[in-house]
Amino acid sequence: MHSLQRKVLRTICPDQKGLIARITNICYKHELNIVQNNEFVDHRTGRFFMRTELEGIFNDSTLLADLDSALPEGSVRELNPAGRRRIVILVTKEAHCLGDLLMKANYGGLDVEIAAVIGNHDTLRSLVERFDIPFELVSHEGLTRNEHDQKMADAIDAYQPDYVVLAKYMRVLTPEFVARFPNKIINIHHSFLPAFIGARPYHQAYERGVKIIGATAHYVNDNLDEGPIIMQDVIHVDHTYTAEDMMRAGRDVEKNVLSRALYKVLAQRVFVYGNRTIIL
């Protein structure tokens, strides 16, 4: 007796009439129940995006073969189990984003398995170990950037995570590192991108006299702070704020934006197309 499973079908394809009917009819043929369905058409690119949450008894290979025969050429589809995902978190010294994720994972605010936390400094070890989660130190001292990234990537691979989360990990990643985890690395940047790219954005914002500050969660690609944006938010500031005041206020925005972005990613709601995201 097979037990019911829940899976998420994600489809990107050239837009045509009748796509929803084709996909849902195949799901019906396989006696699968559609729990939730969301779709979007990008008229500028002519692309159709659909996320379908299914429940039933699955034969993945025949389901995907039937979909391939029904969808237009150039379609991309994937079928993955719904539910909990596994992450590795990379850190340096700042605790606010890491602490927020640890608390939410521990108390049910975020349905995720934190397999490990890896840092290039030992500063946050005691915080992590309070939650009975492994902490690994991979120091960058005496190593080139390529050598350190190689060691970090090997350490991450040992845990086989679905995603790598940069919770204020303050090192620029090499293209070789990024290539090992395509569209799997999520970063929180302490500004409302594309403004104030790079280091010390709060000091840049202070010098410009900005009236809002923000944070951006994005996928990491080869270009610094230019990967597809997942989530952003801002708060208002004024002339009385020092750069340090902005930093303190910004930390709350950063941790909230990161956890909200991660919630969407873990639920398999974020589609990457080009340098944009579609969230369904």
Swiss-Prot record:
The keyword Cell membrane does not apply. GO terms for molecular function: formyltetrahydrofolate deformylase activity; identical protein binding. The active site is at D225. It catalyses: (6R)-10-formyltetrahydrofolate + H2O = (6S)-5,6,7,8-tetrahydrofolate + formate + H(+). Keywords: Hydrolase, One-carbon metabolism, Purine biosynthesis. One of its GO terms (biological process) is one-carbon metabolic process. Gene3D superfamilies: 3.30.70.260, Formyl transferase, N-terminal domain. It is an enzyme of class 3 (hydrolase). Pfam families: ACT (PF01842), Formyl_trans_N (PF00551). Pathway: Purine metabolism; IMP biosynthesis via de novo pathway; formate from 10-formyl-5,6,7,8-tetrahydrofolate: step 1/1. Residues 8-86 form the ACT domain. Activated by methionine, inhibited by glycine. InterPro entries: ACT-like_dom_sf (IPR045865), ACT_dom (IPR002912), Formyl-FH4-Hydrolase_C (IPR041729), Formyl_transf_N (IPR002376), Formyl_transf_N_sf (IPR036477), PurU (IPR004810), PurU_ACT (IPR044074). The keyword Oxidoreductase does not apply. Its EC number is 3.5.1.10. CDD domains: ACT_F4HF-DF, FMT_core_Formyl-FH4-Hydrolase_C. GO terms for cellular component: cytosol. Catalyzes the hydrolysis of 10-formyltetrahydrofolate (formyl-FH4) to formate and tetrahydrofolate (FH4). Provides the major source of formate for the PurT-dependent synthesis of 5'-phosphoribosyl-N-formylglycinamide (FGAR) during aerobic growth. Has a role in regulating the one-carbon pool. Belongs to the PurU family. HAMAP family: PurU. NCBIfam families: PRK06027.1 (NF004684), PurU (TIGR00655). Homohexamer. This is Formyltetrahydrofolate deformylase.
